[in-house]
C-alpha cells in the first residue's frame, strides 16, 4: 500500500519505493514544517476523528458522544492545518497499518496519523516499536487504540529505550489496570483530543477541581503529564489554571491503579461536557506514565512518591482532604516547569520524580507490606502493616526467647503495638523484663538454697553458685549485651534487693553471701559503672591494702566490676558482721570465689575488702599475716569458728578463687594475701581461673543439693533455649532454601548397564536425540 500511495504522493514516491515508513515520515515532515508544531494537538485530535469514524467506533461509543462537539471545534480551529496535512495522512495511515495488517482503516484515519507520524519521525525507537506493531499487538482494542498507543509510544519513547520496551505491552495500559478498564479512559482521551477549545473550557480551575474532587485522589499521578499536555494545547489563560491544576495533580498522592478506573469513568461521563476531556487526555498520558510509574515504583519505590503525604494518603488518617488547594500543589516540587508543553517536559516529569520528589523512606516498607499481603501497592493500611511485620519478626525472636526463658509472652505483648519509634524501647523493655524474670527465678532458687542448704552446704551451695554464676553471667550478657546501662541499672536494683539479704546473710552465715554474689554477678557490669564505691572500700581497706595496695586496687576494680554497691553494703555490713563472724566471711569468700571467677574477685576483694570493711578482723590477718603479727589469730579464729573443714574448703575456694582473682588482677597480691592469710589453712597455690573452675566444679558436684541441681538445670535450659531458638531459625532457613532446590541427580540411576542401554534405546527411538542425551546420561 505504501507503494501505491507513493505513486499518489510525489514526496513518498521520491523518498522510497519500499514500504519503509521512517523515510516517508521524515519527508512528510519537511513539507509541513508548521504541522510539526501542532503535531501533538493534531495527533490527539486526529485520533479523535479516527475514533469517531463509524468503522472505528467499535469500542468507543462514549468517545463518539463526547467527540462531535469538540471535533467540530477542532476542525474549525485546525482546518488549515488539516488541509495541509490530509495528503500525508493517507500514506501514513497506509504505512502504519500495513506492517500490522490493519490497512483496512479508512483514509481519514490515515490522515489523522500523519501529524502523529511527524512526531514519530524524530523518535526512531518509537518508529521501531510501531513498525514491529508490538504496542498494537499487545492490545486487543484494534487500530484506534493502537493509534492512541502510538501517540503514547511517541511521547514515552522520547524518554528511554526502557520506556519503549515497557510501552510495547504495558506502556499503554496502566500497569495494574485491566485493559478493559483502560478502554473508557482511552475513549475519553480521544474525546479530549478533538480540540483545544473544549480543553480550554475544561481547564478552568473550578472545573478542574470539580473533576478532581469527584475522582478525588483516584487520578493517578500520571495525570500530571496529561495536565502539562493540556497546558501545552490550551490558551495562555487556561494554561495558568492548568498549571495550578497540574500542581494539584502533582500534589495528589499516587493512587492504586484500581482507583484509576474511577477517574477514567468519570472522565468518560464528563467527556460529553468536554471538561473531562482534559482529564481523559491527562489519563492518556498517564497510560504512558502509569507504566513508567509502575516500573519505577517497583524498582525505585521511594523515588516516585511525590511526597510523604501522598504516600500516606492511602492511610485513612492521612487522606489528603482535597487536592484543590493550589498552594499545596505548588509546595510539591513539580518535576518540570508547569509551563513547558513538550513531551520532553513530560519525560522530565517521569524521570525527575526520582530525583526531585522527596523520596519516601517508608514507601519501600509500604510496598513490602503490600507485596506481603498481595494487595495493590497503594493498599490503605500499608504503613501500619509494616510495623507489624517488622515488629513481628523482632518479636518472634524475642518472644521465642522470652517464652523459652519465661514461658510467658508478656514483653512481646507490649512490643507489637509499639510503632517503629518504640521498637528500640520495646526491645529494651523486653530484655529488662527477661532479666527481671530471671532474677526472680534466681532469687527464689537462691533463697530456697540459702534457707535450707546454705549453712549445711557452705561449700556445696557456694560451688553451685560458682557453677551457676557463669550461666547467670552469660545470660545477663546475652540479654544485656546491648543494654548494660539500662539492663544493669535494673539489675543492680534487683540485685541490691537480693543483695540486701546478702549483707543480712553474712550475719547469719557466711554462705548466704554466695547467693547474693550470684546476683552480684550481673552487677559486675553494673559495678564497673560504679568503681567509686569500691574506692570507699579501698579507703576502708586502706588499713589492709597498705600491706597489699596493689592487690587491693585491682580487687577494687574487680569489686567495681563484680559488686560496686552491694559489695560496699555487704562489706560495710561485713565490717560489722564479718568481724563478729570472721569464719563466716571466709565462707562468703569461698562462696564468692566459687560463685564467679569475677565474683571470686569480688569475694577475694571482699576477702581483701572484707578485711578492708572489717579491718579489725582481716586487716589484722592480712597485715599481721604479711607482717607475721597477730594476723594469724584473726585467721585462726576464722579457722576455728569456720572449722577446719571450712578452712580446707576455704583453702580450695580461696586457692581456686583468690589466686585466680589475684592472677587476674595482681598475682603478687594474691601470693601476698594468701600467703599471709592461708598459712592458717594451707599455703594456697596460686591457680589460674581455669584451675579455679575445675576444683569448684568438682567440689560442687560432690556437694550439690537436689534443689541446686534443679536450679542449675533451669538456668542451663534458659541458656539453651536462647541458643536453640537461634539454631532453630538457622535450621528453618537452611531447610527452606534446601527444600527450594529440588534439582537432584537423575531420578533413576541405573546400576544395571543393560537397563541403561535399553533406556537409551527407548529415548533414541521415541524422543529426539537432543532431548535423549540428557535422559540417557544418568
Curated annotation (Swiss-Prot):
Cellular component aspect of the GO annotation: cytoplasm
This protein's encoding gene: TROAP
Name recorded for this polypeptide: Tastin
Species of origin: Homo sapiens (Human)
Cysteine disulfide links: none
Electron transport among keywords: no
Comp. bias regions, Basic and acidic residues: 1-11, 560-574
Residues where Phosphoserine is found: 16, 98, 170, 324, 334, 344, 362, 376
Tissue: Strong expression at implantation sites. Was exclusively localized to the apical side of the syncytiotrophoblast. Also found in macrophages.
Subcellular location: Cytoplasm
Gene Ontology BP terms: cell adhesion
Stretch list, region Disordered: 1-115, 212-244, 406-425, 508-587, 600-641
Amino acid at each position: 500500500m505504501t507503494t501505491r500511495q507513493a505513486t499518489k504522493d510525489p514526496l513518498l514516491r521520491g523518498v522510497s519505493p519500499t514500504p519503509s515508513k521512517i523515510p516517508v515520515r521524515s519527508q512528510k515532515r519537511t513539507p509541513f514544517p508548521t504541522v510539526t508544531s501542532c503535531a501533538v494537538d493534531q495527533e490527539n485530535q486526529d485520533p479523535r476523528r479516527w475514533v469517531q469514524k463509524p468503522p472505528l467506533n467499535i469500542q468507543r461509543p462514549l468517545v463518539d458522544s463526547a467527540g462531535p462537539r469538540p471535533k467540530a471545534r477542532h476542525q474549525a480551529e485546525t482546518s488549515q492545518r488539516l488541509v495541509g496535512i490530509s495528503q500525508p495522512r493517507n500514506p501514513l495511515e497506509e504505512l502504519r497499518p500495513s506492517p500490522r495488517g490493519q490497512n483496512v482503516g479508512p483514509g481519514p484515519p490515515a490522515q489523522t496519523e500523519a501529524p502523529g507520524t511527524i512526531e514519530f519521525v524524530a523518535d526512531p525507537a518509537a518508529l521501531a516499536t510501531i513498525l514491529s506493531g508490538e504496542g498494537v499487538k499487545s492490545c486487543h482494542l484494534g487500530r484506534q487504540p493502537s493509534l492512541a498507543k502510538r501517540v503514547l509510544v511517541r511521547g514515552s519513547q522520547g524518554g528511554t529505550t526502557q520506556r519503549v520496551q515497557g510501552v510495547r505491552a504495558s506502556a499503554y495500559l496502566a500497569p495494574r489496570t485491566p485493559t478493559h478498564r483502560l478502554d473508557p479512559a482511552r475513549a475519553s482521551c480521544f474525546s479530549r483530543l478533538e480540540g483545544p477549545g473544549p480543553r480550554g473550557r475544561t481547564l478552568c480551575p473550578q472545573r478542574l477541581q470539580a473533576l478532581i474532587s469527584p475522582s478525588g485522589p483516584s487520578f493517578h499521578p500520571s495525570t500530571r503529564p496529561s495536565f502539562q499536555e493540556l497546558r501545552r494545547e490550551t490558551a495562555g489563560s487556561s494554561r495558568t489554571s492548568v498549571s495550578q491544576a497540574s500542581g494539584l495533580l502533582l500534589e495528589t498522592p499516587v493512587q492504586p491503579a484500581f482507583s484509576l478506573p474511577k477517574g477514567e469513568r468519570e472522565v468518560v461521563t464528563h467527556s460529553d461536557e468536554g471538561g473531562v476531556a482534559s482529564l481523559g487526555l491527562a489519563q492518556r498520558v498517564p497510560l504512558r506514565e502509569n507504566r513508567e510509574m509502575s516500573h519505577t515504583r517497583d524498582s525505585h519505590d521511594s523515588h516516585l512518591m511525590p511526597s510523604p503525604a501522598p504516600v500516606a494518603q492511602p492511610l485513612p488518617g492521612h487522606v489528603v482532604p482535597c487536592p484543590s488547594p493550589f498552594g499545596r500543589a505548588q509546595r510539591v516540587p513539580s518535576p518540570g516547569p508547569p509551563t513547558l508543553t513538550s513531551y520532553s517536559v513530560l519525560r522530565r516529569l517521569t524521570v525527575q520524580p526520582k530525583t526531585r520528589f522527596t523520596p519516601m523512606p517508608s514507601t519501600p516498607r509500604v510496598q513490602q507490606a503490600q507485596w506481603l499481603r498481595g494487595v495493590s501497592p497503594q493498599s490503605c493500611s500499608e504503613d501500619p502493616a509494616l510495623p507489624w511485620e517488622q515488629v513481628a519478626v523482632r518479636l518472634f525472636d524475642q518472644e521465642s526467647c522470652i517464652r523459652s526463658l519465661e514461658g510467658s509472652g508478656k514483653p512481646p505483648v507490649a512490643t507489637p503495638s509499639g510503632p517503629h519509634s518504640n521498637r528500640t524501647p520495646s526491645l529494651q523493655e523486653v530484655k529488662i523484663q527477661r532479666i527481671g524474670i530471671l532474677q526472680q527465678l534466681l532469687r527464689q532458687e537462691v533463697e530456697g538454697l540459702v534457707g535450707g542448704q546454705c549453712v549445711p552446704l557452705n561449700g556445696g551451695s557456694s560451688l553451685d553458685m560458682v557453677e551457676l554464676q557463669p550461666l547467670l553471667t552469660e545470660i545477663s550478657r546475652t540479654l544485656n549485651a546491648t543494654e548494660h546501662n539500662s539492663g544493669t541499672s535494673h539489675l543492680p536494683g534487683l540485685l541490691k534487693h537480693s543483695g540486701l539479704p546478702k549483707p543480712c546473710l553474712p550475719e547469719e552465715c557466711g554462705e548466704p553471701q554466695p547467693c547474693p554474689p550470684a546476683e552480684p554477678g550481673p552487677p559486675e557490669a553494673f559495678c564497673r559503672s560504679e568503681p567509686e564505691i569500691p574506692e570507699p572500700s579501698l579507703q576502708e581497706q586502706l588499713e589492709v591494702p597498705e600491706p597489699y595496695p596493689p592487690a587491693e586496687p585491682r580487687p577494687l576494680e574487680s569489686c567495681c566490676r563484680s559488686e560496686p554497691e552491694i559489695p560496699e553494703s555487704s562489706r560495710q555490713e561485713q565490717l560489722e558482721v564479718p568481724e563478729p563472724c570472721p569464719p563466716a566471711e571466709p565462707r562468703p569468700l569461698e562462696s564468692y570465689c566459687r560463685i564467679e571467677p569475677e565474683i571470686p574477685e569480688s569475694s577475694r576483694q571482699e576477702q581483701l575488702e572484707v578485711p578492708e570493711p572489717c579491718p579489725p578482723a582481716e586487716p589484722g590477718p592480712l597485715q599481721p599475716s604479711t607482717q607475721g603479727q597477730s594476723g594469724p589469730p584473726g585467721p585462726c579464729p576464722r579457722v576455728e569458728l569456720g572449722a577446719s573443714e571450712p578452712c580446707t574448703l576455704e583453702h580450695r575456694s580461696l586457692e581456686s578463687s583468690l589466686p585466680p582473682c589475684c592472677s587476674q588482677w595482681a598475682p603478687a597480691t594474691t601470693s601476698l594475701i594468701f600467703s599471709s592469710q592461708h598459712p592458717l589453712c594451707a599455703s594456697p597455690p596460686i591457680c589460674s581461673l581455669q584451675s579455679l573452675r575445675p576444683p569448684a566444679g568438682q567440689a560442687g558436684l560432690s556437694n550439690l543439693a537436689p534443689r541446686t541441681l534443679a536450679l542449675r538445670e533451669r538456668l542451663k535450659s534458659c541458656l539453651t533455649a536462647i541458643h536453640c531458638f537461634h539454631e532453630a531459625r538457622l535450621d528453618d532457613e537452611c531447610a527452606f532454601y534446601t527444600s527450594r532446590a529440588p534439582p537432584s541427580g537423575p531420578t533413576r540411576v541405573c546400576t544395571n548397564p543393560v537397563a541403561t542401554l535399553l533406556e537409551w534405546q527407548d529415548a533414541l527411538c521415541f524422543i529426539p536425540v537432543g532431548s535423549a542425551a540428557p535422559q540417557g546420561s544418568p
